């Protein structure tokens, strides 16, 4: 492992470099340092390549080639873990070589990489740490030492504070699944978050990046460590007004929130402009896409699927409710306010950040480097939503097919039906036409 640190660089400047030794030098590459102002910028987000064989290498390479073509002005790649497959063993160096030299080479020759530790990247030989050169200050001050150096670090780009961290070491020190406690997360990691926010108080956006999910809608939804993560870190996110959490791990596309991290419910009036489309059991079971999400009073949680081959599939509402005893989140289905489903192909996100909004465009890729838009949404942070609720009651006569009710109200933000037990059922709508076809008798 060879690492170098460049110092004394000037902002917004192009530098060229090569790597090697006398008689054996690489080609000359170049990079541009960040500007010091808060101008708009783009970055790329990918996750879960799980490099294990040539098919997985190629799927991830499609994502990289397509992303380089789609967003040539992106400043860096944020990768939220599971670079390779051979976790919990002595990591195969072949997998790492393929990730750097084949799959991601189209991107890494032109931009920086912000890596996030995933569970498949953890190995007894500490191989993850040999491939990255991130800040190690957290490890030097933590009372409970994580396994790897440099897995918890932050940086500022434009008007955004990025806080990259890991859940992987939650079991070091004292912890309890039953009580939802972890001294590592609630002390060291939580205080680190507080320190970063205190150090950079004037950035508009606070973005966290982590591999394992705090909220998700697929195979890891009922994991007991996920419940522990929520118990220890959601209060911290609420305290610090974390705006956007970019995750990995569950290999599906999901836009969740903005969530009040105390109540684990959607912040009233925070979701607008979601488009209703025909549902698809795998790609879009809720029939929603797009949207504008106001994170002034909550946090938006996001996963864009996988840049590779391994895919999971979305749970139904019944499956989510059946897992309540484990995940302990009431109304989990209602947290999926944007598009939710399986893209069915390698995916990447092009994320534009300005002082007024964050725009997220997610594309799928193929062997021909063809980008196909899968979803796009915006994040804003407005103090006053300007939303006034007009609560009305109406008799509903569902037929389970295509019933709708109409209203003369305009500028509708959301519609809920409430049964006699007080349970809330969010209803899709298109302008002044409210879809009630999925409601059962008696509501």
Sequence positions of predicted segments:
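Generic short beta-strand
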Residues: 17, 360, 414-415
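Metal-dependent phosphoesterase/phosphodiesterase active-site architecture
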Residues: 1, 25, 126-208, 213-222, ...
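Short coil/turn segments at beta-strand junctions that form active-site/ligand-binding loops
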Residues: 75, 111, 203-205, 413
């Amino acid at each position: 492992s060879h690492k170098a640190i460049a110092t004394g660089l000037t902002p917004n400047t192009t530098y060229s470099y090569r790597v090697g030794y006398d008689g054996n030098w690489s080609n000359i590459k170049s990079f541009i340092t960040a500007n010091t102002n808060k101008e708009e910028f783009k970055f790329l987000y990918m996750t879960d390549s799980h490099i294990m064989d040539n098919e997985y290498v190629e799927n991830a390479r499609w994502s990289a080639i397509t992303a380089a073509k789609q967003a040539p002005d992106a400043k860096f790649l944020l990768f939220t873990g599971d670079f390779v497959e051979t976790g919990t063993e002595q990591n195969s160096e072949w997998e790492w070589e393929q990730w750097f030299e084949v799959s991601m080479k189209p991107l890494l020759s032109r931009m920086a990489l912000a890596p996030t530790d995933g569970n498949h990247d953890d190995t007894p030989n500490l191989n993850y740490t040999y491939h990255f050169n991130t800040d190690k200050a957290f490890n030097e001050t933590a009372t409970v030492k994580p396994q790897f150096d440099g897995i918890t670090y932050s940086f500022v780009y434009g008007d955004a504070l990025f806080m990259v961290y890991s859940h992987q070491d939650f079991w070091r020190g004292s912890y309890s699944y039953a009580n939802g406690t972890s001294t590592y997360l609630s002390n060291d990691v939580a205080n680190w978050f507080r320190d970063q926010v205190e150090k950079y108080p004037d950035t508009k956006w606070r973005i966290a990046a982590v591999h394992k999910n705090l909220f998700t809608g697929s195979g890891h939804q009922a994991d007991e460590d996920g419940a522990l993560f929520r118990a220890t870190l959601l209060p911290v996110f609420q305290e610090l007004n974390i705006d956007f959490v970019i995750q990995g791990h569950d290999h599906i596309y999901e836009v969740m929130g903005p969530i009040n991290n105390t109540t684990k419910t959607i912040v009233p009036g925070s979701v607008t402009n979601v488009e209703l489309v025909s549902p698809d059991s795998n790609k879009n079971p809720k029939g929603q896409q797009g949207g504008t999400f106001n994170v002034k009073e909550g946090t938006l949680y996001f996963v864009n699927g996988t840049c590779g081959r391994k895919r999971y599939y979305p749970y139904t509402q019944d499956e989510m409710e059946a897992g309540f005893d484990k995940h302990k989140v009431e109304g989990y289905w209602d947290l999926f306010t944007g598009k939710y489903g399986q893209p069915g192909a390698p995916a990447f996100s092009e994320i534009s950040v300005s002082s007024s909004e964050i725009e997220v465009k997610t594309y799928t890729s193929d062997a021909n480097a063809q980008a196909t838009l899968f979803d796009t949404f915006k994040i804003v942070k407005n103090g006053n939503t300007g939303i006034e609720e007009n609560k009305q009651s109406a008799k509903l006569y569902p037929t389970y097919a295509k019933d709708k009710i109409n209203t003369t109200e305009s500028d509708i933000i959301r519609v809920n039906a409430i049964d006699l037990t007080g349970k809330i059922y969010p209803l899709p709508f298109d302008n002044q036409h409210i879809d009630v076809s999925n409601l059962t008798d008696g509501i």
